[in-house]
Amino acid sequence: MARSDVLVSADWAESNLDSANIVFVEVDEDTSTYDGDHIAGAIKLDWRADLQDPIKRDFIDTQQFSKLLGDRGISNDNTVILYGGNNNWFAAYAYWYFKLYRHDKVKLLDGGRKKWELDGRPLSTDTVTRPATSYAAAAPDNTIRAFRDEVIASIKIKNLVDVRSPDEFSGKLLAPAHLPQEQSQRPGHIPSAINIPWSKAANEDGTFKSDEQLAKLYADAGLDRLKETIVYCRIGERSSHTWFVLRELLGYQNVKNYDGSWTEYGSLVGVPIELGS
């Protein structure tokens, strides 16, 4: 897959802000970031309020996703350009959602907000609304999603890639250092998992490293590209970034994101856990 199939540059984005069939969507960890300013014409998706089921711990389902996108003015024919802060980590999470519900016309803005702001490109404070559409999401593509039982059965068999920080992997922390240390009941990592922090795939300006650099990163860490691969983090957003790198940029086959991640696994009774590096 060519990079142009899944990524757009900031130059391209700025030249296509007014294109009728393109919808720019911002998705941030800090869901108030968009409210301060955003790329002109972009709409907002709140990863917690919009993409998570309000009752059970799971994604919104096919009907809910259809309603969400229809209400926000996105049609099945639109090309969606996702971007956000912190090297696009939650934008990559949303990208994986779109792929889960088989919306193929979706790309990431390489570098996200960070690159856009470093370039000094314009931002807007205008309120953006789009006319509602009748969006029809497809049934989820669970070939890109890993579930608990498959993960447990994959220990010492498939590639398990823990993309959290070394301190989370070793069990010193339960969550990134800037966040509350909560959600999972136990620290540590899944036995046989390789620790390759997600952020190593990005340059200082938030753009993705070259294919050659990325291939070397994962090969040097011992990842066997001939095996099936499951990536995980704490809640699935950082592992979505690595899923994007492995599948969409490097062309790995059979890569799944375990969105339950450590929040689920670290709270299970009786499953194997390892501490240390």
Swiss-Prot record:
It catalyses: thiosulfate + hydrogen cyanide = thiocyanate + sulfite + 2 H(+). The keyword Repeat applies. The keyword Transferase applies. Its EC number is 2.8.1.1. It is an enzyme of class 2 (transferase). Keywords: Repeat, Transferase. Pfam families: Rhodanese (PF00581). The active site is at C233. Contains two rhodanese domains with different primary structures but with near identical secondary structure conformations suggesting a common evolutionary origin. Only the C-terminal rhodanese domain contains the catalytic cysteine residue. This is Putative thiosulfate sulfurtransferase. Substrate binds at R238. Disulfide bonds: none annotated. Residues 18-125, 154-274 form the Rhodanese domain. Gene3D superfamilies: Rhodanese-like domain (3.40.250.10). InterPro entries: Rhodanese-like_dom, Rhodanese-like_dom_sf, Thiosulfate_sulfurtransferase, Thiosulphate_STrfase_CS. May be a sulfotransferase involved in the formation of thiosulfate. GO terms for molecular function: thiosulfate-cyanide sulfurtransferase activity. SUPFAM superfamilies: Rhodanese/Cell cycle control phosphatase.
